[in-house]
From Swiss-Prot:
<comment type="similarity">
    <text>Belongs to the KRE28 family.</text>
</comment>
<dbReference type="GO" id="GO:0000776">
    <property type="term" value="C:kinetochore"/>
</dbReference>
<keyword id="KW-0175">Coiled coil</keyword>
<dbReference type="Pfam" id="PF17097">
    <property type="entry name" value="Kre28"/>
</dbReference>
<dbReference type="GO" id="GO:0180019">
    <property type="term" value="C:Knl1/Spc105 complex"/>
</dbReference>
<feature type="coiled-coil region">
    <location>
        <begin position="115"/>
        <end position="249"/>
    </location>
</feature>
<comment type="function">
    <text>Acts as a component of the outer kinetochore KNL1 complex that facilitates microtubule-kinetochore interactions and the spindle assembly checkpoint. Kinetochores, consisting of a centromere-associated inner segment and a microtubule-contacting outer segment, play a crucial role in chromosome segregation by mediating the physical connection between centromeric DNA and spindle microtubules.</text>
</comment>
<dbReference type="GO" id="GO:1905325">
    <property type="term" value="P:regulation of meiosis I spindle assembly checkpoint"/>
</dbReference>
<keyword id="KW-0158">Chromosome</keyword>
<comment type="subunit">
    <text>Component of the KNL1/SPC105 complex composed of SPC105 and KRE28. Part of the ten-subunit outer kinetochore KMN network that includes the KNL1, MIS12 and NDC80 complexes.</text>
</comment>
<protein>
    <recommendedName>
        <fullName>Outer kinetochore KNL1 complex subunit KRE28</fullName>
    </recommendedName>
</protein>
<dbReference type="InterPro" id="IPR031361">
    <property type="entry name" value="Kre28"/>
</dbReference>
<keyword id="KW-0137">Centromere</keyword>
<dbReference type="GO" id="GO:0031619">
    <property type="term" value="P:homologous chromosome orientation in meiotic metaphase I"/>
</dbReference>
<keyword id="KW-0539">Nucleus</keyword>
<dbReference type="GO" id="GO:0005634">
    <property type="term" value="C:nucleus"/>
</dbReference>
<keyword id="KW-0995">Kinetochore</keyword>
Length: 370
């Protein structure tokens, strides 16, 4: 499988190299054609400059590179103006020479002399008109040929430019396609590596030694949790025993001390007030208050014992939920975290207690239905 990918990679690299080579060759040929055209234009202008002083190249061409330079057109306007003036002067001179020629021709005695008395003569005007028509016709013919040639050159240049653009676009599209193939090949290689890694991981997971080690780690973690729960249970049992001793001493003292008896009755009335006014939900029992530690606890029969610590008069500081078993109380961590996340920090103690009791009663009912 890897050899197949290597073969594809070699072919893609080969195609990329060929594409780059042909693209560079095409660009080089295009550049050479442009330079050849510029060289030909420059040579034509040089030849014109040698034959006509109106077209000149300043300075001498000392090297081959300088002979390929494009003519500086900055002085063309001045040359054009001079050329126009010279053409007008040539026209006037031509007319003068033609007039003189006609004058000499027709004033000298001859058997075929034309009777032309002046430039305003009808015969002279007619001949001049014919000459201008012939001249204009010849000029128009040459102009049409020049325009047709220019149009052909323009069309050929456009076709050549379009062909060059098409070649460049083809090379560009080919390069993009090869880059996409290369990216897909890399992605395929990555996916195969991930698949191989996943298969190796599955093999490792099926290894009995690794599984045994993971089970051992899980057992150690469970033992640690059990030890923590046993310590928590021991602390709660010590608290219950201390509370029972306190109640026992309170009863003994209350029999002898009227003040203690009065406080005990007030505490019982306070518990009854909480049971009737602040905890209206049925199904709770064994409400106990601990004013000094700001704690109180109650049972949601027959499964849960709840211990709540108040931060102030309106806020829960801590909530602990324990499950009852035959001998001790065991903290239900999952349920405890759920209730903490939902009600810890609530600003309404009454609604918070109401919701906690509802939640625990639903758990009791769900367990009973199962």
């Amino acid at each position: 499988m890897k050899s197949d990918l290597d073969g594809y990679e070699v072919r893609i690299k080969s195609l990329e190299n060929q594409t780059a080579h042909y693209s560079e060759q095409a660009l080089l040929e295009q550049e050479q054609r442009v330079l050849a055209s510029l060289r030909e234009i420059t040579q034509n202008v040089i030849a014109m400059g040698q034959e006509n002083s109106l077209v000149e190249i300043k300075g001498e061409l000392e090297s081959k590179e300088e002979s390929e330079l494009v003519i500086d057109p900055s002085g063309f306007q001045e040359k054009i103006d001079t050329f126009v003036e010279l053409v007008e002067l040539l026209k006037v001179t031509h007319l003068e020479q033609e007039t003189l020629d006609n004058f000499l021709r027709y004033t000298i005695s001859s058997s075929n002399l034309l009777q032309i008395n002046s430039v305003q003569d009808a015969k002279y005007v007619e001949l001049e008109s014919q000459v201008k028509e012939l001249e204009q016709g010849t000029l128009e013919s040459h102009k049409r040929e020049i325009e047709a040639t220019k149009g052909q050159i323009k069309n050929l240049c456009q076709e050549l430019s379009m062909a060059q653009d098409s070649i460049n676009e083809t090379f560009l599209d080919t390069s993009n396609a090869l880059e996409e193939c290369d990216a897909l090949l890399n992605e395929l290689t990555q996916l195969r590596m991930e698949k191989q890694t996943s298969e190796e991981a599955d093999t490792i997971e099926d290894d009995p030694v690794s599984q045994t080690y993971e089970d051992w780690e899980s057992l150690q973690k469970s033992k640690l949790e059990l030890r923590l729960l046993e310590e928590e249970t021991s602390r709660l049992q010590s608290r219950v025993e201390s509370y029972e001793d306190y109640q026992k001493r309170s009863r003994q003292l209350s029999n002898n001390d009227p003040r203690m008896l009065q406080n005990h009755k007030a505490l019982e009335l306070l518990v009854e007030l909480w049971m009737t006014k602040f905890l209206p939900q049925p199904g709770i029992s064994h409400l106990e208050l601990f004013p000094q530690s700001r704690k109180f606890q109650f049972d949601v029969e027959p499964t849960f014992t709840v211990v709540i610590t108040l931060a102030d008069q309106t806020t829960f500081q801590n909530v602990q939920v324990y499950r009852k078993d035959a001998k001790s109380l065991v903290m239900d961590h999952g349920l405890n975290d759920e209730i903490k996340n939902s009600y810890l920090g609530t600003n309404n103690i009454y609604n918070g207690l109401n919701d906690i009791i509802h939640t625990l009663q639903r758990r009791v009912q769900a367990k009973g239905s199962n």
